[in-house]
């Protein structure tokens, strides 16, 4: 039986949304241990080399990172396999570019550029609200942050707006009907809509009914739902497509219209 941490990842076992081809090697970069799960993260090497095409190979990615040009959530990262994940802000000082990792409706991480102002904060979903030693209250967010002395009105499943420079909570959004949400898992991954209502299932998974801007309704599990703002007023800029999933026929019609057929 194997002992200790796994250090390799076969290419065919890598997450599909990394979009790695099957034939250019046996292995894929295995993400380091970090704030996001392996299957919900994107290593910096995949982002810089495969998405942005700023490097041709892993050696060049290492050279870029070692010049300390790349920051994730305001902190310099030099690990090529550092796992960036949903809502993380990646800043490239050399090119003055900022990106936020968000999903498109196909379930992949979109290359979504944002302004300097928007790059100063991120949103975090509250996973846990507890009392620590000596009765100090704290919350834990989806990206592993522990924030002490939060607003007492913050509950699990709410979303907090975190200032990246100080790490403090500047605002929060309650989980309620009518709020704008992003789906972060399941078959509706990447869709954006407003909460219609929540279904409780004791001993099972709570379900959330969501309606998108085209009035299509769909259902997903509560732990796949991430509140991003009020209806019509998201706290972050949305990626191309605005989180609206089209049917295959609608995609075909849109393609034909663009081609002038």
UniProtKB/Swiss-Prot annotation:
Function: Component of the ribosome, a large ribonucleoprotein complex responsible for the synthesis of proteins in the cell. The small ribosomal subunit (SSU) binds messenger RNAs (mRNAs) and translates the encoded message by selecting cognate aminoacyl-transfer RNA (tRNA) molecules. The large subunit (LSU) contains the ribosomal catalytic site termed the peptidyl transferase center (PTC), which catalyzes the formation of peptide bonds, thereby polymerizing the amino acids delivered by tRNAs into a polypeptide chain.
Family: Belongs to the eukaryotic ribosomal protein eS4 family.
Ranges for domain S4 RNA-binding: 42-105
Keywords: Cytoplasm, Isopeptide bond, Phosphoprotein, Ribonucleoprotein, Ribosomal protein, RNA-binding, rRNA-binding, Ubl conjugation
Note: Present with 573 molecules/cell in log phase SD medium.
HAMAP family documented for this protein: Ribosomal_eS4
Gene encoding the protein: RPS4A
Entry-linked PROSITE patterns: RIBOSOMAL_S4E, S4
Subunit structure: Component of the small ribosomal subunit (SSU). Mature yeast ribosomes consist of a small (40S) and a large (60S) subunit. The 40S small subunit contains 1 molecule of ribosomal RNA (18S rRNA) and 33 different proteins (encoded by 57 genes). The large 60S subunit contains 3 rRNA molecules (25S, 5.8S and 5S rRNA) and 46 different proteins (encoded by 81 genes).
Subcellular location: Cytoplasm
Designated name of the protein: Small ribosomal subunit protein eS4A
Organism, as annotated: Saccharomyces cerevisiae (strain ATCC 204508 / S288c)
Location in chain, cross-link Glycyl lysine isopeptide (Lys-Gly) (interchain with G-Cter in ubiquitin): 62, 134, 161, 168, 174, 179, 211, 233
Modified residues (Phosphoserine): 32, 247
PANTHER family the UniProt entry points to: 30S/40S RIBOSOMAL PROTEIN S4, SMALL RIBOSOMAL SUBUNIT PROTEIN ES4
